[in-house]
C-alpha cells in the first residue's frame, strides 16, 4: 500500500517539529489498520491552517460561523473501481493550528500529538466513519487511540 500526503502549511506559527512529522508513514500505518488492502495507492491532502481560514470553510460548507479543529472533505464515492495501481484520491483534511494549540495546552499534551489525533480523525471521516451518536463516537475515538499507539504516540487521555 502506498499513501501520498500532500502537505500544505498555511499557518506560519506551526513549528517545524509538526510540519516535519512522518505523515506518509503514519497515514500508511493507519490505512493498513482501518482498511487493509494490498497494492492500493492512495492520495490525500493535509492542510494545516489558521482559525480564520477554517472558520471560513466551516461557514461555507457547514453553515457554522465558528472555527473548528478539523474538517474533512471526502472525495470517495466508490462508484467506479480504479485500475490496480491507480491512485485513489481520498480527499482533504484541514486542521486549524490555532485550535490545535489551544486544545493541546488545555489537555496537557504536545501539539504534535494533538495534530496527529486530529489528522487521524479526519482520515476516518474520509473513509466514511462518522459519529452521529455517543456509541459511534466512542468507536471512532477507540480507533484513533489505537492508530496513534501504532505509530508510537500516546493518545490524548482526555479524548479517549
From Swiss-Prot:
Chief place of localization: cytoplasm
Cofactors required: Zn(2+)
Keyword rRNA-binding: no
Cofactor binding, note field: Binds 1 zinc ion.
Compartments where found: Cytoplasm
InterPro entries, per the entry: MetalPrtase_cat_dom_sf_prd, YbeY, YbeY_CS
Molecular function terms from GO: metalloendopeptidase activity; RNA endonuclease activity; zinc ion binding
Residues annotated to bind Zn(2+): 121, 125, 131
Enzyme class: hydrolase
Superkingdom of origin: Bacteria
Gene Ontology CC: cytoplasm
GO terms (BP aspect): rRNA processing
Pfam families referenced in this protein's UniProt entry, alphabetically: YbeY
Enzyme Commission no: 3.1.-.-
Disulfide bonds: none
Keywords tagged on the record: Cytoplasm, Endonuclease, Hydrolase, Metal-binding, Nuclease, Ribosome biogenesis, rRNA processing, Zinc
Family: Belongs to the endoribonuclease YbeY family.
Annotated function: Single strand-specific metallo-endoribonuclease involved in late-stage 70S ribosome quality control and in maturation of the 3' terminus of the 16S rRNA.
Annotated protein name in UniProt: Endoribonuclease YbeY
